[in-house]
Regions:
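Surface-exposed acidic/polar loop and edge beta-strand patches at domain peripheries
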Residues: 1-142
């Protein structure tokens, strides 16, 4: 089950879900919503984090070192519950890492950290990917 977290400054309030570390709301101090709020008829999502691949893979997968892997559309981060590893009033850090489930689609050892920070009326987003293995790791973020 996902949780909803809030960070804020004097000028901005941001809500982020632990499911996919997805930003769900960005409001100014008057309560004006800046983010699309989703509509199942068109597109129910808001602000997806796409990792380790952006878009659809040709034939739904790829071959690496002679083995074929099938990858979900836009990768698996959007469907993963992230851990919160740090939270302050204006900043939150989400984290996910490889697991037996992710390795069925992406055969690499990794850590993936997303930092959201509200500074005055701006939202800063920082992505950090750590390759924990010995081989070159290919990935994309969107």
């Amino acid at each position: 089950m996902s949780d909803l977290y809030q960070i804020k400054s004097e000028h901005l309030q941001v809500e982020i879900s632990s499911l996919g570390a997805q930003v769900m709301s960005i409001k100014d101090k008057e309560g004006l919503e800046y983010l699309w709020q989703g509509d199942p008829q068109f597109w129910a999502e808001r602000f997806l984090v796409l990792f380790p691949y952006v878009a659809r893979m040709s034939e739904g997968g790829y071959t690496y070192k002679g083995k074929t892997y099938h990858m979900d559309l836009h990768g698996f981060a959007k469907d993963t519950i992230f851990q919160v590893i740090k939270q302050e009033e204006n900043k939150i850090v989400f984290f996910m890492e490889d697991s037996p489930v992710t390795r069925t689609q992406f055969p690499f050892e990794f850590g993936f950290e997303i930092t959201y920070e509200v500074v005055e009326a701006k939202l800063w987003i920082t992505y950090q990917v750590q390759n924990r293995g010995m081989e070159k790791m290919y990935f994309g973020i969107g």
